[in-house]
Amino acid sequence: MALQLRPNCEYCDKDLPPNAAEARICSYECTFCADCADNELHNVCPNCGGGFERRPIRPAIERRPGVCVTKQLPSDKRVHLKYSVEDVAAHCARLRDIPPQER
């Protein structure tokens, strides 16, 4: 199963196309732009509490059969935070000084 490529930052709603180098994901594939992940969320996923990594870029060219962005399409469903900005800020403040591997 291919990684789900969500089309937007869940915090600021910025478009994050499949080839966006600034897309960040947590281990549950929650998706945020680098600016929000670093400056608003402080490397704390507001949904699970985990950290973020760069989202891999799916190849645009089919170099192996069936393996490219046109054969395994990105999601077109926009996802938004389930929590208030205030709740997210408090959640991130509680966890930001704990390394992701210890959360």
Can you say where each PLM-predicted feature lies in the sequence?
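Intrinsically disordered, low-complexity regulatory regions in eukaryotic proteins
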Residues: 1-103
